Amino acid sequence: MGLTLPALHTHTQIVGGGGRPFGGKKHSVEPVQKRSYEANFYPVFDDSSPPGADYFRELARVSKRRIIWGGNFFLEHLDTASCLIVWDKKRRGMDQADCEIAGTDLPGQSRIFDFRWNGMLQGDMKHKETRIHATQKPVALYAWIYQRWAKAGDKILDTHLGSGSSRIAAWDAGLDFWGCEIDKTYYDLEEERFAAHAAHQNLFLL
């Protein structure tokens, strides 16, 4: 796998697998907005090799609970999958998926989060998010997850940081957060996005 996380059962929850899709082909996706040369295109990446059993064993070693986006492809790697999280993107008749599914080992029943994510149309147009990543998820989705399943003192790890939406929501909720991103271009864009969000929020604290 090439990754060994240092802490043993210290991260309370993992919200992983959200930064990279796996479908057996290479992707090169045009972003919605062009802010700089680096953002003019998403780097081509090979998604033909989804995480194997070693990846999920490592997640289990360092976590107590796991939320894995795209988890409908990895249910055999979760101890229990009675609670699925479904993000309904409120779009129908498109050539893309109507929803995304996270496999979890959380207790309880499956839950649905409704939030439009259809081109330029988003569920919260007042706080519309600039798209910087091919599989970007809204901050509101992670905020809802943390509100429902996280508590003060929890530590969050995202092994596929991507656009950094999970990090922004964790920061807003006052949760400790660790993130990993394999692609430097995505990491730099995520850092820029997070810094802008934190600076904006800090204005209200002055």
Residue ranges of predicted features:
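Class I S-adenosyl-L-methionine
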Residues: 5-206
